[in-house]
Swiss-Prot record:
It comes from Bacillus subtilis (strain 168). This is SPbeta prophage-derived uncharacterized protein YomP. It comes from the Bacteria.
Length: 63
């Protein structure tokens, strides 16, 4: 399940600035934001704006 702030940004219940502030106060984690990108709730661009670094997808090898 995603964090409230991830869902709020997706539903336009919160602004990007509000989510950035929530991130600053540890109300949403980098991992929760990555999960939001992975689940198409937020964009990689929004992730980068909030966290201050580019989103990198992690793919697991099955070898």
């Amino acid at each position: 399940m995603s964090n409230f702030w991830v869902i709020a940004l997706n539903k336009n219940w919160a602004t990007l600035d509000q989510v950035k502030e929530a991130y600053y106060y540890d109300d949403v984690t980098k991992e929760e934001l990555k999960e939001g990108v992975d689940n198409n709730l937020i964009t990689p661009e929004q992730y980068q704006e909030i966290v201050g670094e580019a989103y990198t997808s992690v793919t697991l090898s099955t070898e």
